[in-house]
Structures are given as C-alpha cells and as structure tokens.
Design a protein with these regions (language model features):
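Bacterial N-terminal signal peptides that target proteins for export
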Residues: 1-10
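An anionic, turn-rich surface loop/hairpin at beta-sheet edges
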Residues: 105-123, 160-186
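Short, solvent-exposed aromatic-acidic interface loops
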Residues: 140-147, 163-168, 199-206
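A short, polar/proline- and glycine-enriched secondary-structure boundary/capping micro-motif
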Residues: 146-153, 169-174, 206-212
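Mid-length scaffold segments of soluble, non-membrane domains
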Residues: 88-158
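Amphipathic/hydrophobic helical signal segments and adjacent flexible N-terminal regions
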Residues: 22-89
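Edge beta-strand at a domain terminus
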Residues: 72-76, 175-187, 192-216
C-alpha cells in the first residue's frame, strides 16, 4: 500500500506542477518591472531572432523594385544598426506609421502563408506614451491598434510587450492569451526626435514590422 500511495502522491505533485507551469505560460505576470518575467516563451524567441527577421525582411523587400525604392529613400529607418543611445520615448503625444516588410510572420513560418509581399506602408496615426518610471503605457490609434507596455532595458533600447486590437474591438486582448495577437519588439532612437518600434516575426502579414514614431 505504501508503494501505491507514494506513486499516487508523486503523480499528484507532478500534475500540480504541470498545471502551475501551464498557468504561468498562459497568464504571465504583467505586474513585473523586468520584461523577462512578463514575456511569453514565444515572444522571447522572437526578440532573440530580431536580426534574422531584419535580414529576411530586407532581402524580401529588396527583391521588388518598389520595395527597394522605399528602403533606399530612408536608410536610417531601415538600417538594423542605426541605433542612437539615450533619449528614450517620454510621455506625450506622437505620430506613428507602420511599414510591413516581407512575408507573413507566424503564418509564413508554419508554411500556410500566401506569397510574400515586398513592403506595405500604412498611414500616419496618433499614438501616445503615458506614465512615468521603468514601465510606461504605449498605444496607437487606427484600424489595427497596438497597446502595451514599454519596459526600460538598456540605454539604447526599450522593450515593448503588448497586443494587437482590430477593427471595432472595444478593448485590447490581455497579453499572453493569443500568440497571433501578442506583440514583442524594441523601441530604438534613430535620429533627432525620431524613433522606431521593431517587431520581429509578427503574427500577421509580414516578416518584420517597423513602426516610425515622431512627436505629434
């Protein structure tokens, strides 16, 4: 009987631990100040592969004459190594415009994407940063809306973790609930009063998204 009880207890402990691990994976600690405690496993992988995303996206965009022309017209925005230390995004009103480079992100990796699109650019929309300290809120307006948190990381990068809201949805989905809606990227300063949010391997449409950010 003792062997049976020990086996049952061991199985119960394993089940509890597995359930706790699953709960953590589904519900990240969004109150943490360190982004590593918040980011999902999938988003940490996206961030680690940021340069791979740049290389693939630029190659795909340059393969089309129209995409190559857009890249050549703004070398600072589309240079992966164009990063200026200091002067991170402060609270205030901004304007944002997103460029989608390459294929179809997660769909492309799964082999279910349609043929790659070289480069798509969106219209300028209003965006804003709110709050003080090591964590600040960032949100954009428009049909496809980003909403999430900026985490201080280094003197040249801020980490963004958030979600994508679509159409007439009243509120953004909680982070960590849907891989396709989750967003993870770096905010980098690339010029005088000019930044970009780089999103490697997003869930929809592209290999890399580059959001240009300037004061309103």
């Amino acid at each position: 009987m003792r062997g049976v009880w020990l086996g049952t207890a061991t199985a119960l402990v394993a089940t509890v631990l597995a359930g706790a691990a699953l709960a953590h994976a589904r519900d990240p600690d969004t109150t943490a100040v360190d982004w590593r405690a918040v980011a999902t496993v999938e988003d940490r992988q996206r961030l680690r592969e940021w340069r791979d995303a740049w290389v693939k996206a630029l190659a795909e965009a340059r393969a089309d004459p129209a995409g190559a022309a857009v890249l050549s017209a703004d070398p600072a925005l589309f240079n992966p190594d164009q990063v200026i230390r200091g002067e991170m995004l402060k609270p205030g009103a901004y304007r944002c415009r997103t460029y989608r480079l390459g294929g179809n992100g997660a769909e492309r990796l799964a082999g279910t994407a349609p043929p790659p699109r070289a480069l798509l650019s969106g219209a300028w929309t209003a965006c804003r940063v709110e709050g003080e300290g090591p964590k600040r809120q960032f949100a954009t307006d428009g049909v496809q809306r980003a909403s999430g948190v900026l985490f201080d990381s280094t003197d040249s990068r801020t980490i963004f973790l958030g979600t994508l809201a679509l159409g007439d949805e009243a509120r953004p989905m909680p982070y960590g609930r849907d891989l396709r809606r989750d967003m993870a990227g770096f905010v980098e300063r690339i010029g005088e009063a000019r930044w970009r949010l780089v999103l490697p391997f997003p869930g929809f449409q592209s290999t890399l998204d580059v959001m240009e950010i300037v004061p309103a």
